[in-house]
A protein has these predicted regions:
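N-terminal basic/disordered segments at the start of proteins
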Residues: 2-46
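Small-residue (GG/TT-enriched) beta-loop-alpha framework at ligand/catalytic clefts
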Residues: 2-8, 36-37, 129-232
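Active-site neighborhood for divalent-cation/phosphate handling
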Residues: 6-8, 49-59, 68-174, 270-272
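Short glycine-rich, Thr/Ser-proximal phosphate-binding strand/loop in the N-terminal lobe
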Residues: 34-64, 202-217
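Short glycine-aspartate micro-motif
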Residues: 27-31, 88, 185-189
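Glycine-rich phosphate-binding loops at beta-strand->alpha-helix junctions
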Residues: 238-258
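N-terminal phosphate-binding loop and adjacent alpha-helix
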Residues: 50-79, 217-231, 237-240
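Glycine-rich phosphate-binding/hydrolytic loop that grips phosphoryl groups
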Residues: 263-296
Length: 296
């Protein structure tokens, strides 16, 4: 018996300022994961005016998000609008690596990923590259051919930019770091049983990695390991929390035992949110906001 998948978004923010007939100077930001899909619209004034968050937790292991997306797109006022100034698609996957620009060779992109994964990419995937020009490195990540083809068909002759989720987080935390009064800062982004750790020092990205964990004890161990690896005392730098974490979560309770400088993060100042976003926790959608800040 086929699994029934709920197509209604768990979170929806719409503003009266969004006009689907005037998208030529607006940016459509989409984030795609194994069982989730999110969208954000940055309008002509640089303001985030729409947000939707879909979660397809009932997808079985042999089902793919691509099988659900056509139903989400069908008759969707925003997704079927256009043409857009740009469409930015964040890929939320476990396979990525950052390569310093002087060492990067395009013909070795798949090899970089194979070295990181410990195995070759499967036939239905390829290595995609995004350049962080201001920071002097490139992000290499896996992208599925069917997913790439689907978005290319949905938005023909429109500028598509594919990035890894970590690239959006790098962009968002770079914006936060530029306005920070401290010499260094650590940013933690939580999602399901993963945490992405970013460490900025002297306005340079010194560390970026993603860890999977099964319990909060493992989570605390990984964070303390990173601090030790970077020669940082537990209270030496402020640590900002983003994503799926709350003051009442088990993860927060465990981390607060060891880390005295925890705080919940804020929206990057480079992106303005419409008043309708006021009910959302500021720290919740950092990767989506980072897509809105790309190239800023």
């Amino acid at each position: 018996m086929p699994t029934t998948v709920t197509l209604a978004p768990k979170t929806t923010i719409r503003t009266y300022s969004f006009d689907p007939g005037k998208t030529g100077k607006s940016v459509l930001c989409l984030e795609v994961g194994q069982d989730r899909f999110q969208l954000l619209v940055r309008d002509t004034g640089g303001q985030a005016s729409c947000l939707e968050d879909y979660r397809f937790s009932s997808l079985s292991t042999d089902q793919s998000l691509l099988g659900v997306l056509p139903d989400v797109f069908r008759n969707h006022e925003i997704l079927l609008a256009g043409p857009w100034q740009e469409i930015r698609i964040g890929i939320n996957s476990a396979s990525f690596t950052l390569i310093p620009e002087p060492l990067f060779r395009k013909e070795y992109a798949a090899s970089y990923l194979a070295l990181m994964r410990g195995s070759l990419l499967p036939p239905h995937e390829f290595a995609q590259v995004y350049a962080h020009k201001a920071d002097g490195f490139l992000s290499v990540f896996n992208l599925e051919h069917p997913l790439f083809n689907y978005f290319s068909e949905m938005y023909p002759l429109q500028p598509l930019v594919f990035v890894h989720q970590t690239s959006a987080l790098i962009q968002a935390t770079a914006d936060l770091d530029r306005r920070s009064l401290t010499a260094g800062s650590i940013y933690l982004y939580f999602e399901d049983e993963f945490v992405t750790v970013l460490y900025w020092k002297g306005h340079q990205l010194r560390y970026c990695n993603r860890f999977g964990y099964k319990n909060v004890q493992d989570l605390a161990y990984y964070i303390l390991y990173v601090l030790d690896e970077q020669s940082l005392a537990a209270g030496a730098v402020p640590i900002s929390l983003f994503g799926e974490i709350t003051p009442f979560s088990e993860a927060y309770s465990e981390l607060s035992r060891f880390l005295p400088s925890l705080s919940f993060g804020t929206v990057p100042a480079g992106l303005t949110l419409a008043p309708e976003f006021s009910d959302l926790p500021d720290h919740r959608y950092l990767s989506l906001y980072g897509l809105g800040l790309l190239n800023e």
